[in-house]
């Protein structure tokens, strides 16, 4: 946009002059500033600008504002727990400073309209910061109740005149120093809002019912709720834990959460619930144990008498959460992402780790103390240990996928790119592997399975390669795909660690290695030295090497073995049993 300069009447355009509580983008005459010794109030820390602007307003009738001009760039905060911008400090510090700024501004304001504007701003600040649905509202109210009493007395005329009846009652109680009753009214406002959602049958009525009725007494000890990849499918470690428990503890109540329950078949007696339905919220309210392999929504209230088992979904190669320097994802910032992730991991009672390498990373990336980490291997990998040589089982998988029995199977499973997003939670992926060249080189003897990351939203166009390339992105069990694959091609995906259990050839197609290592996530390990197979940045050399699997196996055997020892040796085929028995024991002790 073009730089735009506009002139305003200082007395008539109060909102334009003061609305952002900032002196930025306003041109001040230095002669006036010097003549009247106008300065920022050094007793304020964050909300200092009004102290300068209001003094300046006393001596001018007009002012100039510049739009669309980048006066400065503010660097991004990478660790919101150690380094904060002024606006991201602890709420208690910020609110105290805002209140001090308000009183300072009131003293400086001589124009009645300016005073009214400042008072309105303070009223809006209270309404926003002490909104009854805030997760820490109880702590906020108790910490600042004396300040709220003082402000209510000062602002009562404005507040009572502009508030709804229920808000007026809260204000009057604060004015009379009855803070406990005022807080009850504050929470009653939330209750009324939920009741209104339910009565009017609004879209979020199920969530409102959950918020109103969820309590510790709801928890039923023999109820376990499972979810995989945010309800996408019946898969991964939660699947294998469930199947073990269904077999050995059939009398428990099992619930699976799905986005589309009708599209997922779950063996046994499990109930299926639709995500965000009334049954979904009831399941999470009643279950004594939650089992998930990815983050669950923060609006689900994990109570003290509930146990949350986080299986996670891979050995980390790319930096995670707290270890990421910069977060480039839609709908969030680095500080916001890390704070929300921290809130999530604080709810985990147990986190499954597949190896010592991962345990050390999880402690840092997820703010986890080691007592909560179970270093037992991934339940989803039990099948890789127990059935790798079960030929009848392998034939069943191949038959299900209609794979020719006389051809070798290549699996291509790339990861997603943080910066290639279309919207929050949805990412694009451009196939760079050159299917045409692979088909020409390998089509007679191989088929290739294409497995995109679960966050990838765009469908693959495989027109012309129907008998060679097969999209298995929606195949629920990736472990079964590993079992029938003669080799794996990946880039920075954690599938390399799971596939390493089989000690088969792996190829690494890292066409954007420089960007991914330095510009996006960064790696925990030495990518160029520690991998159990060759690395390619262009597709043609890759196609030639795929013809010689035995040669690659022999050439990299030492690295394959070292990779197995470091990352795969904990997997012993009994992780599902460990977690299933742990849950059973926990239930028995309740």
Residue map of PLM features:
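N-terminal pre-catalytic "stem/leader" segment of glycosyltransferase-like enzymes
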Residues: 166-281
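Conserved nucleotide-sugar donor-binding catalytic segment
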Residues: 8-89
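Donor nucleotide-activated moiety binding/catalytic core segment of transferases
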Residues: 273-289, 295, 449, 454-497
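Catalytic binding pocket for nucleotide-activated donors in carbohydrate/polymer assembly enzymes
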Residues: 463-467, 494-567
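C-terminal subregions of glycosyltransferases and related glycan-biosynthesis enzymes
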Residues: 68-203, 247, 569
């Amino acid at each position: 946009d073009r730089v735009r300069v506009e002139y305003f009447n200082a007395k008539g355009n109060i909102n334009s002059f003061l609305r952002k509580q900032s002196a930025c983008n306003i041109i001040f005459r230095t002669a006036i500033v010097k003549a009247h010794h106008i300065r920022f109030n050094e007793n304020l820390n964050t909300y200092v600008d009004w102290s300068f602007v209001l003094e300046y307003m006393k001596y001018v009738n007009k002012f100039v504002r510049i739009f669309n001009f980048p006066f400065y760039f503010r660097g991004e905060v990478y660790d919101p727990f150690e380094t904060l911008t002024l606006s991201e400090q602890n709420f208690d510090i910020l609110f105290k400073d805002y209140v001090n700024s308000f009183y300072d501004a009131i003293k400086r304001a001589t124009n009645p309209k300016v005073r009214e504007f400042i008072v309105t701003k303070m009223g809006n600040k209270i309404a926003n910061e002490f909104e009854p649905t805030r997760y820490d509202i109880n702590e906020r109210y108790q910490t600042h109740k004396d300040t709220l009493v003082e402000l209510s007395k000062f602002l009562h005329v404005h507040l009572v005149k502009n508030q709804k009846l229920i808000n007026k009652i809260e204000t009057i109680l604060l004015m009379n120093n009855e803070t406990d009753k005022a807080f009850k009214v504050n929470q009653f406002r939330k209750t009324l809002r939920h009741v209104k959602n339910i009565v009017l049958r609004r879209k979020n009525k199920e969530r409102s019912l959950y918020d109103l009725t969820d309590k510790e007494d709801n928890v039923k000890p023999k109820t376990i709720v499972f979810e995989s990849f945010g309800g996408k499918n019946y898969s991964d470690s939660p699947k294998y834990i469930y199947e073990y428990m269904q077999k050995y503890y059939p009398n428990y109540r099992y619930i699976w959460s799905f986005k589309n329950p009708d599209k997922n078949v779950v063996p046994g007696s499990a109930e299926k619930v639709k995500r965000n339905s009334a049954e979904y919220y009831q399941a999470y309210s009643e279950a004594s144990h939650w089992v998930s392999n990815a983050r669950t929504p923060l609006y689900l209230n994990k109570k003290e008498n509930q146990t949350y088992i986080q299986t996670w979904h891979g050995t980390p190669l790319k930096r995670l959460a707290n270890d990421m320097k910069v977060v480039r994802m839609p709908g969030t910032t680095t500080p916001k992402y890390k704070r929300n992730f921290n809130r999530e991991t604080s709810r985990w009672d147990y986190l499954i780790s597949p190896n010592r390498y991962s345990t050390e990373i999880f402690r840092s990336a997820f703010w986890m103390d080691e007592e909560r980490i179970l270093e037992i291997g991934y339940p989803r990998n039990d099948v890789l240990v127990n059935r790798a040589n079960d030929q009848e089982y392998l034939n069943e998988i191949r038959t299900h996928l209609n794979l020719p029995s006389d051809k070798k199977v290549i699996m291509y499973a790339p990861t997603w790119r943080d910066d290639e997003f279309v919207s929050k939670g949805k990412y694009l992926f451009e196939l760079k592997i050159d299917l045409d060249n692979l088909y020409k080189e390998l089509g007679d003897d191989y088929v290739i399975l294409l497995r995109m990351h679960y966050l990838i939203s765009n469908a693959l166009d495989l027109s012309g390669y129907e008998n060679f390339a097969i999209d298995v992105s929606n195949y629920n069990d990736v472990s079964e795909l590993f079992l029938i694959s003669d080799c794996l091609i990946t880039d920075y995906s954690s599938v390399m660690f799971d596939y390493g259990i089989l000690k088969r050839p792996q190829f690494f197609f890292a066409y954007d290695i420089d960007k991914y290592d330095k510009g996006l996530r960064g790696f925990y390990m030495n990518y160029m030295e520690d991998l159990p197979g060759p690395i390619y940045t262009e597709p043609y050399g890759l196609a030639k090497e795929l013809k010689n699997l035995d040669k690659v196996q022999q050439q990299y055997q030492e690295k394959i073995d070292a990779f197995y020892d470091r990352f795969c040796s904990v997997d012993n085929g009994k992780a599902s049993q460990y977690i299933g028995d742990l849950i059973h024991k926990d239930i028995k002790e309740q």
